[in-house]
C-alpha cells in the first residue's frame, strides 16, 4: 500500500502542471460558454382572437381558421416581403390553439422581439382586414334585403309573412359580428438558464479534478493488480 502511495505521489509531482491546468481550463470553459448561451432569449407574442359571426364557412369557423392562417397563400398575403423558406419557418413557429367555439389563441415565437411582434401583428391584422371586408359584404346584403322588403307593397294576406321575414332579417343583422383581438401580449423566455455560470464553472472544475484523479490513481491500482 505504501508503494502505491509513493508511486501516486511521484505521478502527481511529474504531472502537476496539467493536473492543475485541466480543472482550471474546464472551470473557465464552464463559466464563459454557458454565460453566452444564457444571454440568448426567445420571445413569444400572443393574440386572443374572438371569431366573427356572419355565416362564413371559413372565417367564422374555429376549425378552419388555423388551416387558413397556416396556408402559404395567406402567409404570403400577410408577409409579402418574406422569402419562401422564411414563410416555411414562420409556419413552424406559429401556434394556434382553440380555446372555445368562438375564441382562438395565436402565438408566435422568435429570438428577436421586434420581429416576433411584427410577424404576429401582420398575421392578425391581415385576418382582421379580410374578416371586416367579408362582414361588411354580408351586412350590406342583409341591409339591402331589409330595405327592399320594407319598400315592397304586399297584399293584406302577405303582410304577416312580410313582417316575419323582416323580423328574421333584422334579428340576423343584430347578431352579425366581425372578428376582433380581445387580448395581446409579448412575454420573454430565457433559454439555457438551467444553471448559473458560477455553478457550471464549479462543475467544470469538479470534472477536471475527476479526470486528473482517474489519470493518476487508476493506472497505479491496475499496475498493482497485475
Curated annotation (Swiss-Prot):
The chain crosses the membrane at residues 15-35, 202-222. It is found in: Cell membrane. Keywords: Cell membrane, Cell wall biogenesis/degradation, Membrane, Stress response, Transmembrane, Transmembrane helix. Pfam families: Wzz. The keyword Cell membrane applies. The keyword Cell wall biogenesis/degradation applies. InterPro entries: LPS_length_determ_N_term (IPR003856). The nature of the anionic polymer present in the cell wall of B.subtilis depends on phosphate availability. Under phosphate-replete growth conditions teichoic acids are present, whereas under phosphate-depleted conditions, at least part of the wall teichoic acid is replaced with teichuronic acid, a non-phosphate containing anionic polymer. The synthesis of teichuronic acid is accompanied by degradation of teichoic acid and reutilization of liberated phosphate for other cellular processes such as nucleic acid synthesis. This is Teichuronic acid biosynthesis protein TuaF.
Amino acid at each position: 500500500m505504501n508503494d502505491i502511495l509513493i508511486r501516486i505521489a511521484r505521478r502527481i509531482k511529474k504531472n502537476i502542471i496539467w493536473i492543475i491546468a485541466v480543472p482550471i481550463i474546464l472551470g473557465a470553459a464552464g463559466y464563459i460558454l454557458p454565460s453566452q448561451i444564457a444571454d440568448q432569449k426567445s420571445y413569444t407574442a400572443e393574440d386572443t382572437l374572438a371569431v366573427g359571426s356572419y355565416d362564413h364557412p371559413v372565417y367564422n369557423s374555429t376549425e378552419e381558421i388555423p388551416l387558413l392562417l397556416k396556408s402559404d397563400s395567406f402567409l404570403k398575403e400577410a408577409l409579402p416581403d418574406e422569402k419562401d423558406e422564411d414563410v416555411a419557418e414562420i409556419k413552424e413557429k406559429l401556434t394556434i390553439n382553440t380555446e372555445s367555439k368562438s375564441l382562438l389563441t395565436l402565438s408566435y415565437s422568435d429570438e428577436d422581439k421586434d420581429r416576433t411582434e411584427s410577424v404576429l401583428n401582420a398575421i392578425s391584422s391581415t385576418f382582421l382586414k379580410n374578416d371586416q371586408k367579408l362582414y361588411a359584404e354580408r351586412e350590406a346584403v342583409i341591409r339591402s334585403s331589409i330595405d327592399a322588403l320594407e319598400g315592397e307593397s304586399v297584399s293584406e294576406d302577405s303582410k304577416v309573412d312580410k313582417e316575419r321575414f323582416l323580423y328574421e332579417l333584422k334579428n340576423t343583422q343584430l347578431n352579425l359580428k366581425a372578428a376582433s383581438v380581445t387580448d395581446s401580449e409579448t412575454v420573454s423566455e430565457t433559454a439555457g438558464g438551467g444553471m448559473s455560470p458560477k455553478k457550471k464553472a464549479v462543475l467544470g472544475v469538479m470534472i477536471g479534478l475527476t479526470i486528473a484523479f482517474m489519470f493518476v490513481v487508476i493506472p497505479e491500482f491496475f499496475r498493482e493488480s497485475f
